[in-house]
Amino acid sequence: FKTIKFDSPSLGKPLPEYLILIKTKNHLARIMHIEPSVKRGDEIHLGDEIGRFINNGYFFFWVDAGMHVEVRDLNDYLRARGGYELMPMFASKITEERPVSELKGTVIDASKRNITVKLNKNNVVKIKDNYSLMDCATSLGYGGVLGKFNPEDEIYFNGIKIGKIDRIGNYMSTFKTEKLKVLVNGIGFRGISFIFGREIAKLLPKRYGKPALKKGDKVNIKLKRQEK
C-alpha cells in the first residue's frame, strides 16, 4: 500500500524512521522500526521479508531492535492512537509459580546493549490470590500483566513486591514499579527486563559498552527495593 520515511528523535546524528502500511481488504497493518525492502504496490504474502530491523532515537541504548505493529482503519494511519485492540488467546491457565530461594540463571547472550539470561523460574507474578504473567523493564518505572485487577493491588515476583496496579484494560492491567536495585554477582545494573511467559530476562547495563558478563557465566540475581 505505502511506505513513509521521516525523522526519529535525534541522538546526535541523522536517524530515520520508517512506516510500512500493508493493506488487506478494509484494514491496514501499520509497521514501524523496519527499513523497508518493499515498495508501494508490492504484493505481500505470509512469511515474506519486508525489510530489516533498525535502532534509532525511539530506542534506549539497552533496547534490542524490534518492530511495532498495529491494525488500523484504511484512512487512519498517521495518528499516534487509534489501533484496534488485539485480544490474546490462552492455551492454558496461568498457574502458581512457587518462589525459589535464590534467583539464578545462565548467560545465553551478551552484547554492548544488554545481557540475556536463562532463569531458574518463570516470570509468573502473584496478585492477591491470583497469578499472572508480566512484561516489564524495571528501569522504565512501569509494566503490564495479563488480566483485569483492581487499582492499588500489589504485585509480587518471587516474594518481592515490585509494584502496584494503576490502570485496567479489557484483558490486561498496567502497574507502576517500585524503585528496585538490581545486583548480579555483586554488579549493579540499571534494571532487568522480563518477557511474557518465558524463563528469560535481560539485564540492562548502566551504560553502553563492553558487557560485564559473558556467555556461559552463572549468575545470582538480587532484586532489592530502594529505600525512599
Regions found by a protein language model. Name each.
Residues 1-228:
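Contiguous, well-folded functional domains in the mature portion of proteins
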